[in-house]
Amino acid sequence: MNRADDGAMLLFQSAGSTEGNISISGSTCTYTTFTGAHWSQLSDNSKPTIFKGTVMDSIDEMCDWYVVEFQDSEGKTVREQYILKDGESAGDTISHVYKGDSTGEKTVSAKIVKEENSHLPKVKVSDTSASTSVYGVFQTWDEDNDMNVVGLGTYVVRIHKDQTVAKGDLLESNGDGTAKKQSGTAMLSSTIAKVTANVKIETYSDGSYTVPCTLHCG
């Protein structure tokens, strides 16, 4: 890509509306709007209801992803993503239905292989006040029981029902999945975010609510 002048290099659109872009101005490249998230999982690979903006701590386990590896009818090695069933583990040989073969759908003998992951930890709902292990806040689940945890950029953070926060306040974990106002104005290892507007975006059944913030978790 090579523009003759400043402006948008790439537009991200949904239903005809622009949701974000990559643009240039002089020697500056800007990504707009920016919300940075990481994939993560719970320790038991479950998928409970978690409110958007809930504070999440990293734990001492790494995320697990698996593929099945097998040969197609032409002798080529094929790898497809796979979700472990109860009792299965890496190295097991299983029967797998392959729908992409040139001869049509077929059942093949496949080996379960664990994918390499050296940098994405699993998480839990934060249960420690002023935790220094906060990884970010919950955004959404996908179909494979993986979640997105937002750690950078702009997003919402869930605040405890008994806490009143204001624009400019720094936030830290309240120890129950919600956030509270941090005492002091210095960025600490427990700092999650900074409130950007005195607006309640959503209020949940337990009285907790979300506010817009910039995230500062990594």
Where are the language model's segments positioned?
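Extracellular receptor-binding modules and their adjoining Ser/Thr/Gly/Asp/Asn-rich linkers
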Residues: 1-218
